[in-house]
Amino acid sequence: MPTFSRSATVDWTGTIMEGTGTAKAGTGAFSVPVSFPKRIGDAQGVTSPEELIAAAHATCYAMVVTGALGRANASTKQTVVTCTVTADKTDAGIKITNSHLDVTATGLTGMDAAAFDKMAKEAEAKCPVSNALRGSLAIDVATKVN
């Protein structure tokens, strides 16, 4: 597979506490507001680096886990991945400490719940975003089959 790259840009105006910005995907796929006070408080429709990391991790992992299902000749009617990124406020600043992946398989065929749990946890080790984050924070996976 050829090498590829993706980019995003943030336009920021003002100070850290009073300013705002807009994060934009290089592809034009999204343009979202960002603000430091809302990052650490009530978000009120404004995103944060942590939420964007959660979105990237959930998306990448969903692709990896559904690929693993296909290779195992299994499938779902729907696979939902929710990623929750946790950060602590410290004297040194904000530290991202955990990325938790909840994966729910609805209408699973071709394997039982125990096999899905094992496969889902093994798939995490193959997720490029997990691999980029690993070592900097804890990553865990929880599964549910409906």
Where are these regions (language model features)?
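Extended beta-strand/beta-hairpin segments
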Residues: M1-A55, A62-N146
